[in-house]
Amino acid sequence: MSDDYAIDGHKLAYHPQRIGQLLDAGDDWEKAKSIYPIYMEVSPVGACNHRCTFCGVDYIGYKSISLEFKKFGERLKEMASLGVKSIMYAGEGEPLLHKRINEIVRATHDAGIDISFTTNGTQMDKTFIESSLPLTQWVKLSVNAATAATYAGIHQTKERDFNKVIENIAQATHFKRDHGLTCAIGVQTLLLPE
């Protein structure tokens, strides 16, 4: 939801009033409790279909806990009215495993909140690409390898998942181009000691 001057409204520096409120509140919860975030990271589901060697949340045990769509959907308009401008769906599991992720994206968009994802990309299927990609500002895919064998070792999954992710990226990129979407599609990788 950038403005006409291409100033990214999601950066804290563009919200001096909110910064002032935070500084004034200090450690006083009564003053701080009405200062809301500009950006949120939400984990729609606790389950993950990979067991990455670098995972920082593996300690939670990958419980298959999902956000309840109805309750979360009711909160989205409230969040927007309180100043939340963007939500990144990522977190403690693979966000695209949520059975109603496309409905979550639609409800988030309808509330006027910008949407982004961090995903391993295995579940980024045609339905997600066609229904959610047009409503999303950016998607970051965790590829983390250049070969299927290395990918399988790092992600603790089958080698075929690497090819599936690469195919999904290609499909998303073609769909973006064919439909004139502005959604940024990127990959992340990392360096690990051998």
Where are these regions (language model features)?
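Conserved strand-turn element in the central/C-terminal portion of the radical SAM core barrel
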Residues: I169-E194
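Conserved alpha-helical substructure of the radical SAM core
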Residues: S2-W138, I154, N163, E167
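Surface-exposed cleft-lining segments at the edges of enzyme active sites
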Residues: G153-K158, V187-L191
